[in-house]
Amino acid sequence: MNRFLRMTAVVLAAAFAFLLTGCGGSSASTSFTWFVDNIPANLDPQVATKAEDVIACENLYGGLVRRNASGELVPDLCERWEISSDGLTYTFYLKSGLTYTGTKGAATDYAITAEDFVYAFRRVFDPQTASPYAVEFSAIQNSAAVLDGTADPGTLGVSAIGELTLVFRLSERDDTFLSKLTLPGAMPCDEAFFESTRGTYGLSSTSTLSSGSFYIYNWTASGLFLHRSAASPLVNNLRLVQNTSNTDKSAAQLIADEK
């Protein structure tokens, strides 16, 4: 992932932090339409890099940490974290009882556990994934050897202790590591669900699970329509529609497309 792309992701995340926390207060502000160059096509967070895909992933997936409206890193799916004195070990304690959300807000039996993050990072460093996020997390122990196929994925410096404790071991200090955990590539991935999609993970509404504030309500040729998991005075309905084909559509037409 190059510097430009990384900055794009940061800017998009900041923009949405402002949008989703700064627009509340009235029912008129509970829906937002974002016109993008292309309708999102790939919502696999370990490979998503196009701007419209990153925008969607930033809202569909919750990770270990997130940035609040002030730009500070705060816990998201974890209760807290600890960093060793030498800066080489990061330990996260996940919240209990969390589950993924399916299409149209359907409840699922897929629990969010530490193993989901382990699997996500093994995917990042799987040569077959060709994840652009591998370079961002190159400080993780044995990441280079796993990526080039000379080491077993089980030796990667990401491990689970029980269901709710996740440990990262770095080969060198990286003071930006926490910040990088907000990138799409660091979002959790349930291995059983991933395998069940048979190569279509993140390519359709039925092959995508949400761990974040929004879930997929509909995904059509007209756009990607997201609804917030829990109603709030903030933006509750987010529409990502193509700029070139939808700029002349009325609000009523967009709502009709959403359904």
Regions flagged by a language model, labelled:
Residues D116-V118, R123-A192:
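Surface-exposed binding/hinge segments that line
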Residues S29-A41, T89-Y93, F117-A120, L166-V167, ...:
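Short, well-ordered beta-strand elements
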Residues G24-S26:
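Bacterial signal peptide processing site
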Residues F35-S85, L209-S210:
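N-terminal lobe/hinge region of extracytoplasmic solute-binding protein
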Residues M1-A9:
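Bacterial N-terminal signal peptides that target proteins for export
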Residues E79-E136, Q253-D257:
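Aromatic- and charge-enriched surface segment that lines or borders ligand/interaction sites
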Residues T155, E163-L164, R169-Q242, K249:
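Gly/Pro-rich hinge or "lid" segments in bacterial periplasmic/extracellular proteins
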Residues L19-G22:
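C-terminal motif of bacterial Sec signal peptides marking the signal peptidase cleavage site
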